[in-house]
Amino acid sequence: MPVPASWPHPPGPFLLLTLLLGLTEVAGEEELQMIQPEKLLLVTVGKTATLHCTVTSLLPVGPVLWFRGVGPGRELIYNQKEGHFPRVTTVSDLTKRNNMDFSIRISSITPADVGTYYCVKFRKGSPENVEFKSGPGTEMALGAKPSAPVVLGPAARTTPEHTVSFTCESHGFSPRDITLKWFKNGNELSDFQTNVDPTGQSVAYSIRSTARVVLDPWDVRSQVICEVAHVTLQGDPLRGTANLSEAIRVPPTLEVTQQPMRVGNQVNVTCQVRKFYPQSLQLTWSENGNVCQRETASTLTENKDGTYNWTSWFLVNISDQRDDVVLTCQVKHDGQLAVSKRLALEVTVHQKDQSSDATPGPASSLTALLLIAVLLGPIYVPWKQKT
């Protein structure tokens, strides 16, 4: 503040002190900062919440008040000089001369207490104090952890190359901000939609997300993971999983082959059912359209990708077979329509000769008896007449 040139004499000590105090107050006002370190404060119903506020200067002279909200409709939360605030106490002693801590505690928190709180500095005035500076505000929100995510897959199985939907739900969290991600075998998915309800203010929120996944033939051992991250969680996010083995059906492939003749008049025919899932499978043999009950043996093996192979052996007696024998291997998998594979039996002349030389059947035995009767008949009759 410059000294007017019209003054005939230098100012006295009292005037200099007044000018110095004025300059100090202006500098203090310019340096004043209202510090509210927490942008978000998560609280629990029934507990006590502490709202921090410190100042960097005691100037200008005047009180510090607490409000919830801004504008004309803001709510007065605490005033040291006036009003009755039974649930609010100060952290420090505000009566101390050099106190710069105006933090408060609010006890018995209820859902109605959520909102943004501001500590505001007023300049002392007459007849009323004038608002001078406000802190940035601290949002108080009810902190509630989300429930463990639950992942649900499709109601029915689907074959590879088709798209299926998985849903993920989590409930009861607060505040509303939450992050949800989808993964398949560790790879993040992008085809999903997420909704958080309700859209307005609430005590607790729920999230629901639906992801679309294209099934691959090797997905029997695959997993989808729903990952939820929230400010109330300490450490890793929450995860829910679903196995694609519950959603996929891999249809089998069939192959019927005729093996070299094993013993005598028997031909071994093999039906190989490959790469199917799930395990439930029914296999039947038919010969020229007639269902056969006999089956020599069968084996079930599991592949590395989780699918299965089934091998069935069927023995055919060719000693009295015609040349037009057709064998059919029919498979009904997981309640689906049956699929089948046919094989026309090939019997060579050599195999027929082997079968006829192997073991005499009823017809050949009867022929031998008739020949013996014809040869021995004339001998038997004279011998009978002599006697």
UniProtKB/Swiss-Prot annotation:
<dbReference type="InterPro" id="IPR003599">
    <property type="entry name" value="Ig_sub"/>
</dbReference>
<dbReference type="GO" id="GO:0007155">
    <property type="term" value="P:cell adhesion"/>
</dbReference>
<keyword id="KW-0677">Repeat</keyword>
<dbReference type="InterPro" id="IPR013783">
    <property type="entry name" value="Ig-like_fold"/>
</dbReference>
<dbReference type="GO" id="GO:0005886">
    <property type="term" value="C:plasma membrane"/>
</dbReference>
<feature type="topological domain" description="Cytoplasmic">
    <location>
        <begin position="384"/>
        <end position="387"/>
    </location>
</feature>
<feature type="domain" description="Ig-like C1-type 1">
    <location>
        <begin position="146"/>
        <end position="245"/>
    </location>
</feature>
<keyword id="KW-1133">Transmembrane helix</keyword>
<feature type="transmembrane region" description="Helical">
    <location>
        <begin position="361"/>
        <end position="383"/>
    </location>
</feature>
<protein>
    <recommendedName>
        <fullName>Signal-regulatory protein gamma</fullName>
    </recommendedName>
</protein>
<dbReference type="InterPro" id="IPR003597">
    <property type="entry name" value="Ig_C1-set"/>
</dbReference>
<dbReference type="GO" id="GO:0008284">
    <property type="term" value="P:positive regulation of cell population proliferation"/>
</dbReference>
<dbReference type="InterPro" id="IPR013106">
    <property type="entry name" value="Ig_V-set"/>
</dbReference>
<dbReference type="Pfam" id="PF07686">
    <property type="entry name" value="V-set"/>
</dbReference>
<dbReference type="GO" id="GO:0022409">
    <property type="term" value="P:positive regulation of cell-cell adhesion"/>
</dbReference>
<keyword id="KW-0472">Membrane</keyword>
<feature type="glycosylation site" description="N-linked (GlcNAc...) asparagine">
    <location>
        <position position="309"/>
    </location>
</feature>
<keyword id="KW-0325">Glycoprotein</keyword>
<dbReference type="GO" id="GO:0035556">
    <property type="term" value="P:intracellular signal transduction"/>
</dbReference>
<dbReference type="GO" id="GO:0008285">
    <property type="term" value="P:negative regulation of cell population proliferation"/>
</dbReference>
<dbReference type="InterPro" id="IPR007110">
    <property type="entry name" value="Ig-like_dom"/>
</dbReference>
<keyword id="KW-0393">Immunoglobulin domain</keyword>
<feature type="topological domain" description="Extracellular">
    <location>
        <begin position="29"/>
        <end position="360"/>
    </location>
</feature>
<dbReference type="GO" id="GO:0050766">
    <property type="term" value="P:positive regulation of phagocytosis"/>
</dbReference>
<keyword id="KW-0130">Cell adhesion</keyword>
<feature type="disulfide bond">
    <location>
        <begin position="53"/>
        <end position="119"/>
    </location>
</feature>
<dbReference type="GO" id="GO:0050870">
    <property type="term" value="P:positive regulation of T cell activation"/>
</dbReference>
<keyword id="KW-0732">Signal</keyword>
<feature type="glycosylation site" description="N-linked (GlcNAc...) asparagine">
    <location>
        <position position="317"/>
    </location>
</feature>
<feature type="disulfide bond">
    <location>
        <begin position="168"/>
        <end position="226"/>
    </location>
</feature>
<feature type="domain" description="Ig-like V-type">
    <location>
        <begin position="29"/>
        <end position="137"/>
    </location>
</feature>
<feature type="glycosylation site" description="N-linked (GlcNAc...) asparagine">
    <location>
        <position position="268"/>
    </location>
</feature>
<dbReference type="InterPro" id="IPR036179">
    <property type="entry name" value="Ig-like_dom_sf"/>
</dbReference>
<feature type="domain" description="Ig-like C1-type 2">
    <location>
        <begin position="252"/>
        <end position="340"/>
    </location>
</feature>
<dbReference type="Pfam" id="PF07654">
    <property type="entry name" value="C1-set"/>
</dbReference>
<comment type="subunit">
    <text>Interacts with CD47.</text>
</comment>
<dbReference type="InterPro" id="IPR051755">
    <property type="entry name" value="Ig-like_CS_Receptor"/>
</dbReference>
<feature type="glycosylation site" description="N-linked (GlcNAc...) asparagine">
    <location>
        <position position="243"/>
    </location>
</feature>
<dbReference type="GO" id="GO:0016020">
    <property type="term" value="C:membrane"/>
</dbReference>
<keyword id="KW-1015">Disulfide bond</keyword>
<feature type="signal peptide">
    <location>
        <begin position="1"/>
        <end position="28"/>
    </location>
</feature>
<comment type="function">
    <text>Probable immunoglobulin-like cell surface receptor. On binding with CD47, mediates cell-cell adhesion. Engagement on T-cells by CD47 on antigen-presenting cells results in enhanced antigen-specific T-cell proliferation and costimulates T-cell activation.</text>
</comment>
